[in-house]
């Protein structure tokens, strides 16, 4: 079966929301439209198409990729493909269902809930703990992140460290990450409070001097 790729960068926001009726903010929708052709660069070369209202000009295709595009909401065509979105969530599942893709070809709500757990940034805590416990030089690795459940935890974390980074448990496309030096500002405090209310926690990490990217 041919594959149909779809770029949905609002995926992490949709995961955090959890609803099949999630509506992405306009900025995320514009970002998705601007970069809708991104899957052209990693799609399998054989019998692949990308769901986009933009055309992948052969004049610009210097690598000779065997990829074509079909416009959004082409229900009669979408149902012919195995769909491959950037990420699976309940909203994109509903999108494909509404456009004729057979339910048996889509992940179940239970499977998407598993994806959601794996996408939570708390998984990085276990990952770093694993690396540190097996390293000959654990002091050369960063401290694990801390999951902060209450605003009192947030304030205590800021008081303990000179510079910190706060991250929303589910976020993507460069969003949901804020740096803090010294006292917590009112705006950042408000952001942390909203994230805790919506996502259940906020992740705190010690900020390190950047040496190399």
Predicted regions and their residues:
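Acidic/histidine-enriched active-site and ligand-binding environments that engage anionic O-linkages
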Residues: 157-165
């Amino acid at each position: 079966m041919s594959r149909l790729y779809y770029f949905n960068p609002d995926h992490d926001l949709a995961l955090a929301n959890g609803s099949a009726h999630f509506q992405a903010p306009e900025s995320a929708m514009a970002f998705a439209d601007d970069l809708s052709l991104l899957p052209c660069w990693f799609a399998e070369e054989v019998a692949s198409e990308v769901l986009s209202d933009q055309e992948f000009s052969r004049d610009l295709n210097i690598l000779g990729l065997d990829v074509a595009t079909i416009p959004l909401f082409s229900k009669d065509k979408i149902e012919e493909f195995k769909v491959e979105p950037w990420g699976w969530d309940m909203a994109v599942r509903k999108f494909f269902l509404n456009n004729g893709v057979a339910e048996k070809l889509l992940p179940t709500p239970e499977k998407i809930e598993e994806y959601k757990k794996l996408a939570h940034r708390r998984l990085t805590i276990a990952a770093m703990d694993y690396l540190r416990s097996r390293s000959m030089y654990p002091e050369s690795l960063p401290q694990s992140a801390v999951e902060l459940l209450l605003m009192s935890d947030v304030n205590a974390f800021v008081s303990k460290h000179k510079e910190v980074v706060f991250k929303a448990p589910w976020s993507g496309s460069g969003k949901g990450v804020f740096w803090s030096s010294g006292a917590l500002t009112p705006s950042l405090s408000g952001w942390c409070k909203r994230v805790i209310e919506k996502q259940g926690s906020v992740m705190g990490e010690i900020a390190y001097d950047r040496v190399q990217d």
